[in-house]
A protein has these predicted regions:
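N-terminal beta1-alpha1 cap of cysteine-dependent amidohydrolase-like domains
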Residues: 1-120, 126-134, 138-159, 163-165, ...
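Active-site-proximal beta-strand elements of phosphoester/diester hydrolases
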Residues: 204-209
């Protein structure tokens, strides 16, 4: 209202909208002795924050992806089968890690975030979704098989990532495949499942072999990290400024 009693127009204020991009967060649990294998891939993607649950609490609701890595056998209490001979299982199971990983899978899946599971990670992923394991594979015991052992693969033609040979060292493997999963690769010599994916899900790939131990797997990691970025970007919000 002016001094003469007449209304005056309010000044026009324009609000520009800007996009806020938050650094992508990747949740994982990596044994100290395995960090050297993963660090080169992390260094190649410095824009992604690695949140290691072994070193401290991780807010899973803030994560944009999940990386499951190798380790000791799954604690028996999480297995969906009877353990007839407990002596075949590792004595150094990590109960705290298993609890975290099973919880992480459940929460990450409900939010559609990308998942890459490696070695034990594949086994945890399969069990978490309802599958079972071969608890001890003859000829695959760690005392019999070295980290540099190479296995030939049979690949499904539909698999996005296909390798003729892989570095695969393990004494357990998938027995009954979890519902909703598809096999993408088998060991050519004994039909052990080496690679699976979750159907009707943006990106959930699990491999029995060790892609962290070779440059030939760069494309697999690049694909995974790009999915983590894309998911984080999809959550961006415009705010008035």
């Amino acid at each position: 209202m002016s001094s003469h009693g007449k209304p005056t127009a309010s000044p026009t204020v324009s609000c520009a909208k800007i996009d806020i991009f938050i650094m992508p967060n990747l949740a994982t649990w990596i044994r100290e002795k395995d960090e050297k294998w993963f660090q080169p891939f992390f260094d190649k993607h410095p824009d992604i924050r690695i949140c290691g649950a072994r070193k401290g609490a991780v807010a899973l609701e803030e994560m944009d992806g999940l990386l499951l890595t190798g380790g000791s056998d799954i604690s028996p209490e999480f297995l969906r089968q009877e353990v007839v001979d407990p002596s075949v299982l590792d004595k150094d199971v990590d109960l705290a890690r298993d609890r975290w990983e099973f919880e992480a899978i459940a929460k990450i899946l409900t939010r559609g975030r990308p998942i890459l599971a490696i070695c034990k990670g594949l086994q945890v992923f399969n069990v978490a979704l309802g599958g079972t394991l071969k608890l001890d594979i003859k000829g695959h015991n760690l005392s019999e098989q070295k980290d540099h052992d190479v296995q030939p693969l049979r690949n499904d033609r539909a698999a996005r990532h296909r390798f003729a040979q892989v570095n695969s060292s393990h004494h357990q493997a998938i027995d009954r495949l979890a519902d909703g999963c598809e096999v993408e690769a088998w060991c050519a010599t004994d039909d052990i499942i080496e690679q699976i994916r979750l159907r009707d899900y943006p990106f959930a790939l699990a491999v029995q072999y060790h892609p962290e131990r070779g440059k030939i797997y760069d494309a697999l990691f690049d694909d995974f990290f790009s999915r983590v970025r894309e998911f984080a970007k999809s959550l961006n919000r415009s705010i008035a400024q």
